[in-house]
UniProtKB/Swiss-Prot annotation:
Organism, scientific name: Schizosaccharomyces pombe (strain 972 / ATCC 24843) (Fission yeast)
SS bond list: none
Source organism superkingdom: Eukaryota
SUPFAM superfamilies, A to Z: Chalcone isomerase
InterPro entries noted in UniProt: Chalcone_isomerase, Chalcone_isomerase_3-sand, Chalcone_isomerase_sf
Gene3D superfamilies per record: 3.50.70.10
A cellular component annotation (GO) from this entry: mitochondrion
Protein name: Uncharacterized protein C18G6.01c
Length: 259
């Protein structure tokens, strides 16, 4: 009438009923194992995704240790010479050898480095060659007083427009794209750095270790205009910054400063 399974079930039931403590701890262990297994699986996936994302952001934002300071100087505006911000120009250490090669080729030996950069044609050719060879750079802007991003953007755009070729629709489109992607609705506090970095073909804007915007810099047009604004021609945005940069570039060109 009753099979083997029935007697086995009855035996186990009677045996466990006399040992309630064992039943309790077995249940706790089972539940605990279930609880631990599920979060560990989710945590592992989340951690992997987070680390991958942070690694990509790290390359675009927190790569100051890969950068080398070329020079710095103050930016003054208006006939009153109001000191509005300090600028620092950086390149990646791995690009120093490339810079050396290009300067050796492009600088007019009769003029020297400084006068070559002051010559509109030669200086523009040097900057174009550096960008064509994928030199990556960063501009660090440190305001001397509280300001807003709208005011900074206006100054940057006017500087870019002053360097544009006449009737060049591609440059006009690039400057318009910069204007539309640069944030305006926030404050840039005194002595708090705003970075603008060229990463690949992306021109990124970084503030307080967060990317606040970027644009695709087609053919490095915006980068070219920015660098010319600080380095090329008889008048630049900061003569002291250009002098500082040229001192370093001269050492790189001479081979006395190589990594």
């Amino acid at each position: 009438m009753f099979g083997t399974r029935f007697f086995a079930y009855q035996f186990c039931k009677n045996w466990l009923s006399k040992r309630p403590g064992l039943v309790f701890w077995s249940s706790v262990a089972t539940i605990n194992a279930m609880y631990q297994t599920r979060p560990l699986y989710c945590e592992s996936v989340t951690k992997t995704i987070q680390q991958t994302y942070e690694g990509l952001v790290q390359k675009r934002i927190n790569n100051e240790d890969e950068l080398f300071l070329l020079g710095s100087g103050p930016r003054y505006v208006s006939f009153l010479s109001i000191h509005v911000y300090d600028i620092e120009l950086y390149i990646q250490k791995k690009d120093v050898q490339t810079v050396h090669t290009i300067l050796q080729k492009e600088v007019d030996p009769k003029l020297g480095l400084e006068m070559s950069m002051k010559d509109e044609e030669i200086g523009s050719r040097i900057v174009a060659a550096l960008l064509k060879n994928e030199m990556k750079y960063a501009i660090k802007i440190v305001p001397t007083r509280n300001t807003n991003f709208s005011h900074l953007r206006g100054g940057f755009v006017r500087g870019l427009q002053s360097r544009m070729s006449q009737n060049d629709p591609a440059e006009q489109a690039a400057v318009s794209k910069f204007r539309s992607t640069f944030p305006v609705n926030r404050t840039c506090f005194k002595e708090t750095a705003l970075w603008m970095k060229l990463y690949g073909n992306d021109f990124c804007y970084i503030y307080k270790d967060s990317e606040i915007g970027h644009m695709h810099d087609e053919n490095y047009m915006v980068s070219n205009l920015f660098l010319k604004g600080y380095l090329v021609g008889p008048r630049v945005n900061s003569e002291q910054a250009r002098e500082s940069v040229c001192l370093t570039l001269r050492r790189i060109m001479d081979g006395t400063l190589l990594f």
